[in-house]
A protein has these predicted regions:
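N-terminal mature-domain region immediately after signal-peptide cleavage
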Residues: 1-241
Length: 241
């Protein structure tokens, strides 16, 4: 049994651009895009172009980070569910649950995820193709609702303004409680996007995550995703992030 993830048909760009790694500055370049490991310990990503171009650049710049994030994610799932037979059942359940996921994800997002997947490892192809895995990982937050007893999901946030903040300006904070082990949280990333269409925006997450869990666009519009207990879903839909 397999699912239709509506894999995009793009071919890898024939560009002559190569990743330029400047170790002394903890900086990587790929065309007009870059990834930097700042003194704060955060990864700072800057990408521009259409969806596929952005995804391809993300993959080229962070292939090692993508492999690390996937490894620790899969390792954590194996720790939570140590039984191989149950893992096989869980994989079947996810394939069945997400069988229509592709049609619920906009083409722009699928293109970006596909671009990223071209630089992903084949070590976990027993789960699915790199594209299928990356698309499913983007629904993990939603699937966490169906696994509430494992405490995979639960976020908190606050906002204050006026007399309640030091200078009367709006102050927003959040705690992202999507816990998949300490190792998964090691590589925190702030991504700056310059899309061909739409507003520029910044997003806080981890390597490979294209959704906005905490972010702000150039007009000042701010979004944070906060999960709450809800009814168990019966099928796939557009991931909330």
């Amino acid at each position: 049994f397999s699912a239709d993830m509506q894999t995009p048909k793009h071919e890898q760009s024939m560009t002559t651009d190569k990743v330029i790694d400047i170790d002394s500055l903890h900086l990587r370049y790929y065309g007009d895009n870059f990834l930097r490991h700042s003194d704060s310990g955060l990864w700072e990503l800057f990408v521009k172009g259409d969806a596929f171009q952005r995804g391809e650049a993300i993959g080229k710049l962070s292939s090692d980070l993508l492999h690390y994030q996937e490894k620790v994610f899969v390792d954590q799932i194996r720790e939570i569910v140590p039984s191989d037979s149950y893992l096989k059942f869980l994989r079947f359940f996810i394939v069945l649950f997400n069988r229509n996921l592709g049609e619920n994800v906009l083409e722009e997002y699928r293109d970006e995820i596909y671009g990223i997947s071209l630089s992903c490892t084949h070590e976990y192809d027993f789960i699915g193709t790199p594209y299928e895995r990356q698309l499913n990982y983007h629904s993990a937050h939603d699937l966490g609702h169906a696994m509430q007893d494992y405490m995979l999901v639960g976020c908190s946030s606050f906002a204050t303004w006026g007399t309640q903040s030091a200078d009367s300006s709006l102050l927003i904070g959040r705690n992202f409680d999507f816990y998949v082990g300490d190792a998964f949280a090691e590589n925190k990333q702030v991504a700056f996007y310059v899309p061909e269409q739409g507003y520029r925006f910044a997003s806080v997450g981890w390597p490979g995550m294209i959704g906005v869990l905490s972010g702000m666009n150039e007009t000042g519009l701010t979004v944070t995703i906060n999960a709450a207990k809800s009814a168990v879903p019966t099928g796939s839909a557009t991931p909330i992030s």
